[in-house]
Amino acid sequence: MVADVLLTHFNQLFCLNDPGHPLTGQEMKKATIVEDGYIAIKDGLIVALGSGEPDAELVGPQTIMRSYKGKIATPGIIDCHTHLVYGGSREHEFAKKLAGVSYLDILAQGGGILSTVRATRSASFDNLYQKSKRLLDYMLLHGVTTVEAKSGYGLDWETEKRQLDVVAALEKDHPIDLVSTFMAAHAIPEEYKGNPKAYLDVIIKDMLPVVKEENLAEFCDIFCEKNVFTADESRYLLSKAKEMGFKLRIHADEIASIGGVDVAAELSAVSAEHLMMITDDGIAKLIGAGVIGNLLPATTFSLMEDTYAPARKMIDAGMAITLSTDSNPGSCPTANMQFVMQLGCFMLRLTPLEVLNAVTINAAYSVNRQERVGSLTVGKEADIAIFDAPNIDYPFYFFATNLIHQVYKKGQLTVDRGRIL
């Protein structure tokens, strides 16, 4: 078979492993590493991997050949938890954060999520589209090739749908692949204050059926937290969403442990998000149910909290984890997955290989894209992040700098030395 594109002489290829399930325990520490590696691409798919000089049959007169001595290649990075589409920004809350006002106190004052809801409701489709596109461009420049994107800053049908429509449009227009999550249960709207059950009934009866019918989202999510939605309320919504055919995610145990992990385990959610306050019993329940823990260390960093999710304990117990940005305008205003990966080492005490597995193959399972992406494997899409680094330790050791040299998306050179092509 003659390749369309042949990428050769990488210091190392991090092909990683895909055993047919998310990696856990000791599996997180391992990878298939190819020295002096090459990748052959045809029709956007990986058709061959190897070491040294490529087989002659891969090379034809039209084959594009590029050499990458001194560089490493990994699967494209996957950010599997973002709040991508929103109006406005919240830097006006920064001084309060520095003064020690808590996230929930800011929310109770009408700020936080509710502030962004007001800005998003007043934003046009084009405004939201352009703002979200800029974020995606930034992510792509940092090696991200697949992104999960939630609604949740409308809290009414008109705005929630506008957010989902923006995600759908960007999925068509932008190189990054987007996976849509419906999260109208992100907060209790001011018009339903004191009556969250009535709002959940509106979501269940009026919103979810349309989202499903129009195929606007694959997942459903809810914020199970003190002063937001209780475990019983979360169970009520997610069980109905599951009956309609949605895959489930849940924000749980971020600020307080109030039963969200139990809901995730009972309903076999694909992932439980945040988990800074998870207990040993909660870890055991998620392991037993096969729920992936999606950890968001940049949120802890941004909130200036001391308690990070117990990633080391989770992995050692045999739990599958991912890492994501939680990109949003309030509790985590960043879109930099490289920074998140570095926090995975510095603050969660994970090894570079554990982090790399978390943000590639495990993240692919978290967004139900494991058949297509997440590892450099023959037959999968050629989503490739190329780092200007001699080995996998370097991008973690040399932190706070974008070390992406190039990005390939479905076999197309998409980013070249800081420019989107």
Swiss-Prot record:
Query: Entry cofactor note text?
Result: Binds 1 zinc or iron ion per subunit.
Residues binding N-formimidoyl-L-glutamate are: Y153, N328, G330
Q: Could you tell me the keywords of this UniProt record? A: Cytoplasm, Histidine metabolism, Hydrolase, Iron, Metal-binding, Zinc
What SUPFAM superfamilies does the record point to? Composite domain of metallo-dependent hydrolases, Metallo-dependent hydrolases
Cofactor(s) for this UniProt protein: Zn(2+); Fe(3+)
Positions with a binding annotation for Zn(2+): H81, H83, H251, D326
**Which Pfam families would you find in this protein's record?**
Amidohydro_1 (PF01979)
A Gene Ontology cellular component where this protein is annotated is:
cytoplasm
Subcellular location(s) per record: Cytoplasm
CDD domains in the record: Imidazolone-5PH
What is the uppermost EC class here? hydrolase
Under Enzyme Commission nomenclature, its number is 3.5.2.7
This protein's pathway reads: Amino-acid degradation; L-histidine degradation into L-glutamate; N-formimidoyl-L-glutamate from L-histidine: step 3/3
Q: Where does 4-imidazolone-5-propanoate bind?
A: R90, Y153, H186, E254, S331
Q: Which family does it belong to?
A: Belongs to the metallo-dependent hydrolases superfamily. HutI family.
Q: Matching PANTHER family, A to Z?
A: IMIDAZOLONEPROPIONASE, IMIDAZOLONEPROPIONASE-RELATED
Describe the task this protein carries out: Catalyzes the hydrolytic cleavage of the carbon-nitrogen bond in imidazolone-5-propanoate to yield N-formimidoyl-L-glutamate. It is the third step in the universal histidine degradation pathway.
Q: What is the recorded name of this protein? A: Imidazolonepropionase
Taxonomic lineage: Bacteria, Bacillati, Bacillota, Bacilli, Lactobacillales
